[in-house]
Structures are given as C-alpha cells and as structure tokens.
Amino acid sequence: MSTPGLENLRAHYQRFAEDPSTLGLVPRSAAPYRLFAAAGLLALLVTWFAAFHVGLFERADQSVFLGFDDLSRQPHVSSLASFVARLCNPQPFVYLAVIPVSVALLRGRPRLAIAIAAVLLGANVTTQLLKPLLAHPRAAWVLGGRAPVAAASWPSGHATAAMSLALTSVLAAPGRLRPVVAALGAAFAVAVSYSFLALGWHYPSDVFGGFLVAATWTVAVVATLLGAEERRVRSAPHPRSVTPAARVSLRDALAPPGAAVLGAVALACAVAVARPHEVFLYARAHEAFVVGATAIGAMALALATGLMLALRR
C-alpha cells in the first residue's frame, strides 16, 4: 500500500531523474563540445610532439624544471610541496573524487554523477596507459648533471588528477556557484602542479599533458551526455518545456577568476617586498621558470574558466 508521502517522494525523484533540466547543462547543443574535444586531442598531440621532438621546447622544459628544482632548496618549500602534491596520490584522490559525485547526487542529478565518475576514472586511466606507451628518455642538455625525470612521465598523473577534480567540481556545482568553484579548482590544480614540480617528479610539459587529458575527457563526456539528452528529448512523445535557470551575468562569472589572478599577483608582490634582493636575483637567474610557472597557472585558470563559461546559463 502506497502512502501520499511515498508517492510524492517517488514523483519528486522521477522528476529529477527524467527532466533534462536537472542536469544543469541543457538545453544546449553537443556540437561545440565535440569540437572542444577534438581540439583537446590535437593540443595533446602537439604538446607531446613538442616535448619530445622539438629542441627549443625540450630546452625550455628543462630550464623551467631547473627553476622549480632550485626553488625546492628554499627553507620549508620541500615539506610543504610534499604535503600538497600527495593530495593527488591514489588514496587521497579517491576520497576527493567522492565530493563532486556526491554533490551531483545530492542535487538530484544521477546522470551527471555518472558522467562525473566517467571523467574522473577515464581521464586518470588514460594517463596511466599513456605513460608507459609513450615512455622515452628525455634530453638533459640543460640539467647540468642532475638526474632527468623518469622516461614514463608524460602526461603527469598528478596533474590529470588535480585538473579532473577541478573540472568535475565545476560540472557538479550549481550554476551560480560555478565561477567560484572554477577559480578554487584552478588554484588547487596549480598548487598541486607547482608542488610536484618543485619535488622534481615531472617536467612542465607533463603538467600540460595531464591538464589536456583531463579537459579533453571532460568535454567529451559532456558532449556525450548532451547528445543523449538531445535524442531523448526528441524521441519523447510529449516533450516537456524547460524553464531555464537565471543566467549568471558575464561580470559575475568572471569576477572570481579575476580575483584569483589578482590574488596570485598580490602574493607574488608580497614575497618580492619581503625578500626583494633574493627574489630579483632568482627571477634573473631563472627567467624561463617565471614564464613557465605563469603559463601553467594561466592554462589551469583558462581551462576551468572556459568550462564554466561554456556551461553558463
């Protein structure tokens, strides 16, 4: 025997499970996301080729690596970097991965939760398969006798894990919170990447590769999800109308990423003011490091912000 309370609960769940609007990603076309996925694959191929077969980029890779390696010799840097980098070790990663999946489920979006799990699993398995497949000893012209990174290091598993967590958190978050989540997720991915670079685990190109694997998987899964939604809505005998949620203004969407940039600049200025002589000498001696570190930060913020803007309602 059913009760009114149970019937209401069943109807409530059925509405969440069937209404495409509950995914927070529709009504949208899957076509742009398919193009983004193709562009991600192309960028991944170009990054790999440059890292292994273009002398200019190989030299730059090593120079940035040296800058991070020398940074680890500063007081307390190594211990802090070790703590942050290990947040994306397998066991902590599994615990962190539960968060975006749980958020999607709590918001009544089971298909989105499955998509998020697919990104988190697929991206990281892909990286672990690519590393031995593409393993090749790196050139060490600039390293000055220091041991190069292991041959099976591209793409970085830690960078893939960090960026996949950042991007799936953007997917899971409510629309009005996505700008803040994107900024925080990018900051997390950058912090993890800087940390394992300082520990000498990877070259910077490994970070770019890991970021691109995570981003490509994210947009590919979103494209698949939206394609399935399009087919389901078209085949429904009585398609229900969807009232779009209030759209976040472009100004509000860009405010948190902008604040993240200003915060990074303010932090750099604070360090420079505290130790001006040391910072100036270090920057002069490691110009490639400054450029490379900036590029990693810019790429992380661009990927998280780009996804947030693409999903903006």
Regions found by a protein language model. Give the residues of each.
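N-terminal transmembrane-helix/juxtamembrane module of multi-pass inner/ER membrane proteins
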Residues: 1-96, 131-147, 284-296, 305-313
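Interfacial segments of alpha-helical transmembrane regions
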Residues: 32-38, 102-123
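Alpha-helical transmembrane segments
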Residues: 34-45, 122, 186, 258-267
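C-terminal TM-helix exit segments that contain a strictly Trp-centered aromatic cap at the helix terminus
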Residues: 44-55, 126-135, 195, 263-275
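Structural signal for the C-terminal ends of transmembrane alpha-helices
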Residues: 102-110, 169-176, 222-228, 306-312
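Hydrophobic alpha-helical transmembrane segments of integral membrane proteins
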Residues: 111-143
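Alpha-helical transmembrane segments of multipass membrane proteins
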Residues: 123, 127, 192, 214-218, ...
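Membrane-embedded catalytic cores of phosphoryl/pyrophosphoryl-handling enzymes
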Residues: 143-293
